[in-house]
From Swiss-Prot:
Belongs to the triosephosphate isomerase family. NCBIfam families: tim. Homodimer. The modification Phosphoserine is found at residue 139. It comes from Arabidopsis thaliana. Signal peptide: none annotated. The active site is at residues 96, 166. This is Triosephosphate isomerase, cytosolic. Keywords: Cytoplasm, Gluconeogenesis, Glycolysis, Isomerase, Mitochondrion, Phosphoprotein. Substrate binds at residues 10, 12. SUPFAM superfamilies: Triosephosphate isomerase (TIM).
Length: 254
C-alpha cells in the first residue's frame, strides 16, 4: 500500500489574529493536489486553533503543537488531549526538538505523551532527530533509534502515528540534510521499525522530514523513496508552503 504524502506546517510561536487570517486565506485560495495525493495539516499556536479550525478549507486539517501527558487537572498552563478532542482538533505534534532542548522533555516523557494522546483519539506527529554534535560523533541512528524506541515501548497501534525526522542542526538554520542524508536516516529508521516493531508498521508508517524545507529543495527531498512528506517550519508561514504541498506530485509521477 502506497503511503500518502503528508505535509505539516508548524507555525510555532508566531502570528497575530490578522496574520493568521491572511495565511488561512492564502491556503484557502491555493490550487494543490487532491486529498488522495497529499494530506495537509497546519499547526497554529493554541490561541488560534478555533480561528483556524473554523475558517480553514475542509480538505486541510489542524494540529496542536503540544499537549499534556495525562488527563487535565491542576496543571497550570497545560492543555490536555481531551481538550483538543473536545475542540475537534484531530492532530498534535509531540516531541519537537525545541521542546526536548528548551523544556527538557525526555524521550520517555515524549513516549508517554504519544501513548496518552493516541489513547484519547488524537493522531500524532512524533518528532525525532539528532544534534550536530551527535551527527559528527557518528551516533545519528543510535539517537534516533532510542527516541523511537521510547515511543515503540508504549505504543501498539501505529496507524495514527507519523514520524517526523528533524535533524536539530537543520532546523531554522538554513542548513538542510542533503536528499541522500535524509533518505539514509529514513531508510535506517524504517529498517529499525521492521526489526523492532513489525514489517507492516515499517511499510505503512509515514516518515516525514523536517529541517529548513523550502520551495527550492522540497521536490528533490520528496523524491526520495523513504521520505513521505515534510514537517515545515518557517516556510509554512509563507506562500511557498503551497509549492511544498505541490511537491507531493513527485510521488505520483515516480
Amino acid at each position: 500500500m502506497a503511503r500518502k504524502f503528508f505535509v505539516g506546517g508548524n507555525w510555532k510561536c508566531n502570528g497575530t489574529a490578522e496574520e493568521v487570517k491572511k495565511i488561512v486565506n492564502t491556503l484557502n485560495e491555493a490550487q494543490v493536489p487532491s486529498q488522495d495525493v497529499v494530506e495537509v495539516v497546519v499547526s497554529p499556536p493554541y490561541v488560534f486553533l478555533p480561528l483556524v479550525k473554523s475558517t480553514l478549507r475542509s480538505d486541510f486539517f489542524v494540529a496542536a503543537q503540544n499537549c499534556w501527558v495525562k488527563k487535565g487537572g491542576a496543571f497550570t498552563g497545560e492543555v490536555s488531549a481531551e481538550m483538543l478532542v473536545n475542540l475537534d482538533i484531530p492532530w498534535v505534534i509531540l516531541g519537537h526538538s525545541e521542546r526536548r532542548a528548551i523544556l527538557n522533555e525526555s524521550s520517555e516523557f515524549v513516549g508517554d505523551k504519544v501513548a496518552y494522546a493516541l489513547a484519547q483519539g488524537l493522531k500524532v506527529i512524533a518528532c525525532v532527530g539528532e544534534t550536530l554534535e551527535e551527527r559528527e560523533a557518528g551516533s545519528t541512528m543510535d539517537v534516533v533509534a532510542a527516541q523511537t524506541k521510547a515511543i515503540a515501548d508504549r505504543v501498539t497501534n501505529w496507524s495514527n502515528v507519523v514520524i517526523a525526522y528533524e535533524p536539530v542542526w537543520a532546523i531554522g538554520t538554513g542548513k538542510v540534510a542533503s536528499p541522500a542524508q535524509a533518505q539514509e536516516v529514513h531508510d535506517e529508521l524504517r529498517k529499525w521499525l521492521a526489526k523492532n516493531v513489525s514489517a507492516d508498521v515499517a511499510a505503512t508508517t509515514r516518515i516525514i522530514y523536517g529541517g529548513s524545507v523550502n520551495g527550492g529543495n522540497c521536490k528533490e527531498l520528496g523524491g526520495q523513496a523513504d521520505v513521505d512528506g515534510f514537517l515545515v517550519g518557517g516556510a509554512s508561514l509563507k506562500p511557498e508552503f503551497i509549492d511544498i504541498i505541490k511537491a507531493a506530485e513527485v510521488k505520483k509521477s515516480a
